[in-house]
């Protein structure tokens, strides 16, 4: 006889967290914010050419179905009735671009990932077209014209992929970020799937006006993007549609936030001036600026932080983005073989406790905030014969911390009020060496929740609080207090300053590596195109001349 189901856990809310490296599904108790069960599936990335990064949208979708099914099985093993799951929220890697056929449900091309650099020429061409106001794009979107954002990725597909061109001509194509692809598929796909996104994801496309909270025709005309490709834009917390298949059939999807905005909500940074830093594939520092857009003068982005209800106001954030954080650990493991598992880097760094003067700038995809320098490339400098893999491991962790400090300093200048502590989350925060390094380099306390899944928690909170679900209260007095671990600085401020100044020198050396100019302005191709006869005759003349000069008979 089956064990009786537990009824005391109260209403539950699920959260899909779709990231660059993995997909997870997590289930929380809406009354206590307790994480009850979860499942994770690792994802592959494809690198067809240098600087290109793609993922298979169907693999991503299948990973979501698998995570939901396995988590529900685990809940069943815990005697928890999955009918208690009242809503599902979605959190996703932002900017990553998908275009698919609405009649077949098939992707028309691989998802072009946020890290992808193929659109550099597209960006250069577009920058020449910008009207007289050089801030035309940024004033509407809060974003610089960059390879990072979705509009240029979509423009590249429209220019280069025949399948996409044909589907657009025939009115079959739909565009979206990962959230749009997942929600459309989960709510029925070709059989009535809801084509939508939320304000936080829309604000990362470079097609969305962050003041009017609508798609901007002038921007769409500038990028030559047909507006009928675009999803409907909703708030971050409302019922979008019902799941149409699987263990959670009939459960509403009622929350949607880009991953970094979800983490801001999950860290409960609802007050102006509160900030969090998420350490994942990249590093993302967001500071809540309230109901006003603050435009940075120091290389940061202005973005929509959240809009928790159809009739609720939008809140904004300043954001600094680091392209390579956790990705550097993957690179050390997969490309160099310095470590076998991600956990090895903490052990190696702890062995030496210093980089011994070695500095690592992991600008594999150029530099993001505050430089926005696509010509930069990764460098290791300060190496000696004494340098070993432990020092390089330490330098890799230190690089993440230095990049965070650069963003924090820019944010302090823009906001005018220095942060007194930094709230952190993300997979890398399990690395205690990294967290202590971060406190040392910032010289302020770093505060980490014991429950690190704040991105999932934010998506669950938005879903549970939606009108028509209402199982999660976002009133300040009702919010669950997360238990925190605190890391205090353990070095003198002068030492921190010296190390940071040396890092800045290394950053300067990383810039300008990628250039369309040949060395010395010459054309090296001429040296590979000499006629064979000329080469032989000239070589004989030089040989005879050399023998004559040396006095050889």
UniProtKB/Swiss-Prot annotation:
Alphabetically list the UniProt keywords. Answer: ATP-binding, Cytoplasm, Differentiation, Glycerol metabolism, Kinase, Membrane, Mitochondrion, Mitochondrion outer membrane, Nucleotide-binding, Spermatogenesis, Transferase, Transmembrane, Transmembrane helix
> As annotated in Swiss-Prot or TrEMBL, what is the tissue specificity of this protein?
Testis-specific. Expressed in the midpiece of spermatozoa.
Lineage top rank: taxon: Eukaryota
The positions annotated for binding substrate are 20, 94, 148, 259
Q: In which pathway does it act?
A: Polyol metabolism; glycerol degradation via glycerol kinase pathway; sn-glycerol 3-phosphate from glycerol: step 1/1
Top class in the EC scheme: transferase
Query: What family classification does the UniProt entry report for this protein?
Result: Belongs to the FGGY kinase family.
Q: Can you name this protein?
A: Glycerol kinase 2
* Gene of this entry: GK2
């Amino acid at each position: 006889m089956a064990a009786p189901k537990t009824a005391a856990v109260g209403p539950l809310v699920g959260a899909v967290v779709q990231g660059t490296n993995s997909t997870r599904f997590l289930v929380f108790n809406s009354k206590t914010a307790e994480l009850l069960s979860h499942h994770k599936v690792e994802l592959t990335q494809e690198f067809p050419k240098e600087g290109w990064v793609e993922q298979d949208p169907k693999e991503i979708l299948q990973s979501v179905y698998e995570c939901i099914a396995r988590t529900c099985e685990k809940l069943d093993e815990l005697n928890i009735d999955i009918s208690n799951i009242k809503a599902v929220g979605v959190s996703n890697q932002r900017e990553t671009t998908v275009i698919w056929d609405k009649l077949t449900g098939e992707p028309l091309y691989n998802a072009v990932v946020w890290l992808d650099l193929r659109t550099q020429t597209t960006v250069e061409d577009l920058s020449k077209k910008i009207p007289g106001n050089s801030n035309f794009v940024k004033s509407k979107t809060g974003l610089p014209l960059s390879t990072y954002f979705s509009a240029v990725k979509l423009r590249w597909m429209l220019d280069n992929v025949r399948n996409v061109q044909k589907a657009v001509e025939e009115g079959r194509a739909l565009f979206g970020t990962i959230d749009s692809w997942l929600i459309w598929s989960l709510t029925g796909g070709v059989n009535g799937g809801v084509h939508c996104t939320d304000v936080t994801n829309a604000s990362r496309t470079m097609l969305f006006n962050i003041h009017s909270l609508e798609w901007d025709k002038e921007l769409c005309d500038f990028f030559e993007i047909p507006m009928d490709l675009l999803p409907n834009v909703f708030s971050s917390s409302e019922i979008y549609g019902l799941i149409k298949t699987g263990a959670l059939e009939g459960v509403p999807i009622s929350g949607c936030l880009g991953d970094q905005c979800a983490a801001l909500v999950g860290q409960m940074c609802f007050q102006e001036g509160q900030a969090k830093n998420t350490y994942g594939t990249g590093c993302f520092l967001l500071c809540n600026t309230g109901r006003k857009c603050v435009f940075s003068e120091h290389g940061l982005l202005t973005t929509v932080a959240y809009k928790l209800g159809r009739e609720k106001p939008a809140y904004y954030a300043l954001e600094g983005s680091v392209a390579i954080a956790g990705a550097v650990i993957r690179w050390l493991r997969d490309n160099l073989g310095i470590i076998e598992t991600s956990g090895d880097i903490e052990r190696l760094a702890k062995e030496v406790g210093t980089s011994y003067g070695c500095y690592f700038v992991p600008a594999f995809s150029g530099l993001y905030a505050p430089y926005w320098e696509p010509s930069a490339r990764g460098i290791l400098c300060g190496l000696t014969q004494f340098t070993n893999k432990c020092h390089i491991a330490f330098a890799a962790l230190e690089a993440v911390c230095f990049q965070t400090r650069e963003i924090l300093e820019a944010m302090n200048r823009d906001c005018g009020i220095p942060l007194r502590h930094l709230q952190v989350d993300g997979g890398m925060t399990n690395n205690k060496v990294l967290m202590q390094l971060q406190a040392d380099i910032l010289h302020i306390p770093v505060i980490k929740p014991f429950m690190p899944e704040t991105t999932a928690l934010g998506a669950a909170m938005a879903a549970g609080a939606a009108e028509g679900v209402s199982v999660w209260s976002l009133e300040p007095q009702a919010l669950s207090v997360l238990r925190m671990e605190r890391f205090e600085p353990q070095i003198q401020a002068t030492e921190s300053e010296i190390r940071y100044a040396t890092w800045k020198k290394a950053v300067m050396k990383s810039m300008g590596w990628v250039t369309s100019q040949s060395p010395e302005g010459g054309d090296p191709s001429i040296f590979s195109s000499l006629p064979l006869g000329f080469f032989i005759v000239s070589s004989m003349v030089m040989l005879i001349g050399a023998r004559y000069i040396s006095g050889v008979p």
